[in-house]
Amino acid sequence: LTAPFVLCKKVIPIMEEQGAGTIVNVASMASTAAGRGGLAYTSAKHGLLGLTRQMSLDHGRTGVRINAVLPGPIATEMIARVLAIPQHPVTMKMGMSPAKRPGEPIEVAQAIAFLASDDASFIHGAALAVDGGYTIF
């Protein structure tokens, strides 16, 4: 949480001077719910979402847009190990989610690119879930 805070505080004045800028924070599906054994991680991600929304409110009128993506399970080595366990809660829940698969890193990158683009010019302080519907239920 410290790094995004410090980076935002450094870059926002430059963006305001330019009259425009976009920040996309990478949070997590843990930003909106509690998880097993993740006190520090979940607390930090909740904090990052709060930081995103508050900074968006504080700086949006100066032309700076600040949003966040909330990735769910993404196809990484860690998730592959988890999904190899049929009875793991993540494996079971993913099987019930609309996408029924982990996301690909490129799918998160595309969401970030969208939020950073002019096509998202009316989006401020948003938390875009990129999770294949994992957090619907």
Regions found by a protein language model. Give the residues of each.
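Short, small/polar-rich loop/turn modules that mediate ligand/substrate recognition or access, typified
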Residues: 60, 65, 123-125
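Active-site loop-to-helix junction immediately N-terminal to the catalytic Tyr of the SDR YXXXK motif
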Residues: 34-42, 54, 82
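Residue(s) in the substrate-gating loop at a strand-loop-helix junction
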Residues: 28
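A conserved structural motif in NAD(P)-dependent oxidoreductases
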Residues: 97-108, 119
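Short C-terminal tail/terminal secondary-structure segment
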Residues: 33, 112-113, 124-137
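A glycine/serine/threonine-rich, flexible loop-to-helix segment
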Residues: 61, 73-96
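Active-site helix of classical SDR
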Residues: 8, 44, 52
